[in-house]
Amino acid sequence: MTNIDAPVTVQVAVDPPYPVVIGTGLSDQLDELLANRHRVAILHQPVLTQTAEAIRSHLAGKGVDAHRIEIPDAEAGKDLSVMDFIWEVLGRIGIGRKDALVSFGGGAATDVAGFAAATWLRGVSIVHVPTTLLGMVDAAVGGKTGINTEAGKNLVGAFHQPLAVLADLATLETLPRKEIASGMAEVVKAGFIADPIILDLIEADPQASLDPMGGVLPELIRRAVTVKAGVVSADEKESELREILNYGHTLAHAIERRERYEWRHGAAVSVGLVFAAELARVAGRLDDATAQRHHTILTSLGLPVSYDADALPQLLEYMAGDKKTRAGVLRFVILDGLAKPGRLVGPDPGLLVTAYAGLSA
């Protein structure tokens, strides 16, 4: 198991490479990363104001001209009006190309701060300090940034890799159990597409898997980050292989849009994973036991595995706008077996109806 007292590092082998550091008490690493930056802007959510101010004050004590920029919570922050506000503040405080941003918050904060870094002066450095499980295992790793529009989720964005990701496990201690469970959906995804040991660890003790200061969750984080880092290192710009990280996300993004982004991302991904497994099963690509295993594991973590039985027509409309769609043809990442991701292109409408019926039962 991962020792929470001794930070571990997972390298993301892009150009240039960067570390994902997992542990506790990571302030020294932040100091080192920002040592040569004259000016720094810390983008954070309202609930983290006190801690963000402590970071700002600490950096100021080191001679850094540090500023805070507060952004709205969750998906409300991933809006063009928020970006306009951020750009205005970055200009006012004088962030230059040799300066840096710090994202401090959950996955949505990482997405919007990363997009700000990608677009300001055509790209400035950023360090991600995720404070949620979802941020640690997914949003902060891989360089995807973006905001939402009326057309859909994350359709406006850029690839912009960080200087580093600092995943301080101590920040998870104050999170509600539902928030940790939400992040576990992405961990489970990593298990099904690449690392079945993740699934074994969760099945052995689901509740221990949700304990941020126990021995299981840090190991799950390390393994999930390793899966994503490996995929991103091989396919940074999502030309083909990286698409497997979207397992469960085609339906998930449609659900989020239908729910006006009021559902937790992990809850939507959980439903999306079950749907993708059912779709593979009814298509004859996945065995019954592995499909059922999705349902069992996600349920054991308190995550939803069903959705509104009457919602399919609207969800299909939204899925047609998914970024994986080509020439109007739906594409799904599915499994051909445990840790054997594949694609299902242009499935027969009857398959979609049958798979969704299993989901909404």
Curated annotation (Swiss-Prot):
GO terms for biological process: amino acid biosynthetic process; aromatic amino acid family biosynthetic process; chorismate biosynthetic process. It catalyses: 7-phospho-2-dehydro-3-deoxy-D-arabino-heptonate = 3-dehydroquinate + phosphate. Its cofactor is NAD(+); Co(2+); Zn(2+). GO terms for molecular function: 3-dehydroquinate synthase activity; metal ion binding; nucleotide binding. One of its GO terms (cellular component) is cytoplasm. CDD domains: DHQS (cd08195). Pathway: Metabolic intermediate biosynthesis; chorismate biosynthesis; chorismate from D-erythrose 4-phosphate and phosphoenolpyruvate: step 2/7. It is found in: Cytoplasm. InterPro entries: Dehydroquinate_synthase, DHQ_synth_AroB, DHQ_synth_fam, DHQS/DOIS_N, DHQS_C. NAD(+) binds at residues 73-78, 107-111, 131-132, 144, 153, 171-174. Its main location: cytoplasm. Its EC number is 4.2.3.4. Zn(2+) binds at E186, H249, H265. Binds 1 divalent metal cation per subunit. Can use either Co(2+) or Zn(2+). Keywords: Amino-acid biosynthesis, Aromatic amino acid biosynthesis, Cobalt, Cytoplasm, Lyase, Metal-binding, NAD, Nucleotide-binding, Zinc. Catalyzes the conversion of 3-deoxy-D-arabino-heptulosonate 7-phosphate (DAHP) to dehydroquinate (DHQ). Belongs to the sugar phosphate cyclases superfamily. Dehydroquinate synthase family. This is 3-dehydroquinate synthase. It comes from Mycobacterium leprae (strain TN).
